[in-house]
Amino acid sequence: MSELTALTIAEARDKLKAKAITATELTDAYLSAIDAANDAINAYVAVTHDQARSMAKASDERIAKGEAGALEGIPLGVKDLFATKGVHTQACSHILDGFKPEYESTVTANLWADGAVMLGKLNMDEFAMGSSNETSYYGPVKNPWRAKGSNADLVPGGSSGGSAAAVAAHLCAGATATDTGGSIRQPAAFTGTVGIKPTYGRVSRWGTVAFASSLDQAGPIARDVRDAAILMKSTASLDLKDTTSVDLPVPDYEAALGRSVKGMKIGIPREYRVDGMPGEIEELWQKGIQYLKDAGAEIVDISLPHTKYALPAYYIVAPAEASSNLARYDGVRYGLRVPGKDIADMYEQTRAAGFGKEVKRRIMIGTYVLSAGYYDAYYLRAQKVRTLIKKDFEDVFAKGVDAILTPATPSAAFGLADEVLANDPVKMYLNDIFTVTVNMAGLPGIAVPAGLNGQGLPLGLQLIGRPFEEETLFQAAHVIEQAAGRFTPAKWW
């Protein structure tokens, strides 16, 4: 059965088309793999055995009739942030206990319309707030990778840690994820998978639990660049239910793979050389530059002067929006309810019991920066900085730069329950140092594995593109992937 779960989406698609395998066989292989591994990895918070089998059966019937969709019979995992009709959707928070929506998110509806099969809901940081998948009410996810000669558990990154771990451990063919400040790209880099955060507005946010509405964007995590391109094509669409959704044709992203990057101008931002960055990250970056240079790309030095303000500005804007978005969870209509002596007390008791520590921290920060005395000093200033960050990118792209190459993360995956990071949230927030600028500017960014560190752990590079030019990112990322190879963890679970 493991040979079936080893197939990429592209390989499985071809075998299903040729009737060499059935969707039912493929789905059963994944369900068996999940049942055997999930206690160890904790990637899934709900496994939809019956639904998966009935969807696979329907796929087999459509294939037999010659009516196969673009993702017909491909088994996928869904981050617990996406509404799935009648199925556990709790954003991995205690406050949404037992919530099963009556509607389907646009992203998942698009995937099911193309014939994909749902295996279940994937673990994540609570309300997508975290960089290590340790804030989930359902416990942490373990990275399928381990350092050479060590049995120590590592984090898979966050907030889409369940998505990245499930893809890396072959517990789904691909997964949906979301990215508010790096939540697709950082876990992808930590697990040796490919993750793309599309341009803001390219993929509908309707039916996705909101964290920071002006920053959130859904995208796929997959095993390789081709699979990410295939999933992206099915995910992206115009959606009138999302006012920020953009009416642009969805290109065939897969067709961009294999196109030459000869003459493409790749920018290298000097501000991304941060103090204390490990030598192996700098080495990897140089390797990536060489891969693109060898393929004919032109490498140019660029400056993004406001980069150093991105992280502090992000940790004002995102919590401010979160404090507003999370005000709706009060125990009245759905989810957890803790009784109180009156309605105000019930609200307080429910929110105190329902939200985890990190979520409470961000609600408090957000409420503080939006309060009358501090709005101008913090929130308004952060929004002005955001405009300057966006202008930095616009200036660079106006000079003819096609894409920007940076490291995806400042390190490889770190240990689970790291005491230093647990006691210093700012150190944890620094994990997003290379990724937040992309969300602040609404641009597309892709993380692609480019090598292993000295301990045998995966490291990723990030490519940042012009708005709505995801094709360029797939094109350049494919060049890096072809040169660097693909990376799979040794099985310990």
UniProtKB/Swiss-Prot annotation:
Cited PROSITE patterns: AMIDASES
A single GO cellular-component term on record: glutamyl-tRNA(Gln) amidotransferase complex
Highest taxon of source: Bacteria
Gene3D superfamilies with a match to the protein in the record: Amidase signature (AS) domain (3.90.1300.10)
Keywords, sorted A to Z: ATP-binding, Ligase, Nucleotide-binding, Protein biosynthesis
GO molecular function: ATP binding; glutaminyl-tRNA synthase (glutamine-hydrolyzing) activity
EC number, UniProt record: 6.3.5.7
Catalysed transformations (reactions): L-glutamyl-tRNA(Gln) + L-glutamine + ATP + H2O = L-glutaminyl-tRNA(Gln) + L-glutamate + ADP + phosphate + H(+)
Active site: K79, S159, S183
Top EC group: ligase
GO biological process annotation, one example: translation
Annotated NCBIfam families: gatA
Similarity comment: family membership: Belongs to the amidase family. GatA subfamily.
Function: Allows the formation of correctly charged Gln-tRNA(Gln) through the transamidation of misacylated Glu-tRNA(Gln) in organisms which lack glutaminyl-tRNA synthetase. The reaction takes place in the presence of glutamine and ATP through an activated gamma-phospho-Glu-tRNA(Gln).
Quaternary structure annotation from Swiss-Prot or TrEMBL: Heterotrimer of A, B and C subunits.
Full protein name: Glutamyl-tRNA(Gln) amidotransferase subunit A
Classification of source organism: Bacteria, Pseudomonadati, Pseudomonadota, Alphaproteobacteria, Hyphomicrobiales
